[in-house]
Design a protein with these regions (language model features):
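C-terminal catalytic histidine-bearing segment of alpha/beta-hydrolase fold enzymes
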Residues: 232-305
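Bacterial Sec-dependent N-terminal signal peptides
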Residues: 1-22
């Protein structure tokens, strides 16, 4: 019993020490809404420290930047030497019902709002880079589900001059994007990166995802393009990527961050720091979908009703 008590004290002390390393900032105000970010710092920061901008998931209807799941993940990242900026963003699908390909305007609006907020958060980090010791050349976006959509969409906007991307320096480039079950929304048909190539991107996606398409959904030129469709574009144009496809899995892959930290470290070492131009693709078929939680097979109808 004494050993267990001591262990709990050690764990609690560790979490308290971790909490003391976070500072909260308001990065932008939208009307009366104050959007904030929590900034976590490792014990040592160097010129090669990577800053992860994390975008939480929740279908653009729920979620927050400082949930227990998120904070545990951030501790893993900080322990690996990453800075973490966990941001708020506007949840544009709250109250929306009957979302579909023929009723996609609410989704478009929500994605664009979240993307504008993410770009504003990056602008804040750049403006305060000296104070926060952020290297502007090593900013990597990581997102889950709606956050993954936002992360991919942010890089898409920066590469094409969309939305409020002009608030960032013209030479700014994301160092990487990591998407856990994300997609890109386009009104122009297939995804195109016109002004410069996209950041090296790590894709995680379940092949049976019914909430965010693994392949694509198209209605004339309006489309929602998941990992499979995006990898084909990256492959065609020679863009660097790292894809992990989970055969038979649905949307639960969105929660894969904490169990893939080693992958993230490898990706950042090779794609971000060493700038290796790699294209890595892998299927994972020896997995049992029956072990997945109920939300693994969620559809839009389960969230927007």
């Amino acid at each position: 019993m004494k050993k267990l008590t001591l262990l709990l004290v050690i764990i609690l002390a560790g979490l308290m020490a971790f909490a003391q390393d976070v500072k909260t900032y308001q990065y932008v105000q939208r009307d009366t809404l104050e959007l904030k970010l929590d900034f976590y710092t490792p014990s040592q920061v160097t010129d090669s420290t990577i800053c992860v901008v994390y975008i939480f998931g929740g279908g653009f209807i729920m979620g927050n930047r400082d949930g227990e799941f998120e904070k545990a993940y951030f501790k893993q990242l900080v322990d690996e030497g990453f800075q973490v900026a966990a941001i708020d963003y506007r949840l544009g699908l709250k109250g929306v019902k009957n979302l579909s390909i023929t009723n996609s305007q609410p989704l478009e609006d929500a994605i664009y709002m979240a993307t504008e907020d993410a770009i504003s958060a990056i602008a804040f980090l750049l403006e305060h880079s000296k104070e926060l010791k952020v290297n502007k050349d090593y900013i990597v976006m990581v997102g889950s589900s709606a956050g993954a959509i936002t992360s991919l969409q942010t890089d898409y906007a920066l590469c094409n001059g969309f939305l409020n991307s002009n608030i960032l320096p013209a030479d700014f480039r994301l160092a990487g994007v990591v998407s856990y079950a994300g997609a890109i929304y386009s009104r122009e048909g297939k995804v195109k990166y016109r002004n410069h190539e996209p950041a090296p991107t790590m894709f995680y996606h379940g092949t049976a995802d019914k909430l965010v398409p693994y392949k694509q959904i198209k209605f004339f030129k309006i489309g929602f393009f998941g990992a499979d469709a995006l990898v084909k574009r990256f492959e065609k144009f020679g863009y660097p990527y790292y894809a992990r496809r989970f055969e038979g899995y649905g949307h639960s892959v969105a929660a894969g961050g904490p169990v893939t930290v080693d992958d993230l470290v490898w990706f950042c070492r090779h794609y971000v720091l060493k700038k290796e131009h790699l294209q890595v693709d892998g299927f994972y078929r020896n997995l049992d979908p029956r072990t997945m939680p109920a939300f693994d097979m969620y559809t839009p109808g389960d969230l927007y009703k």
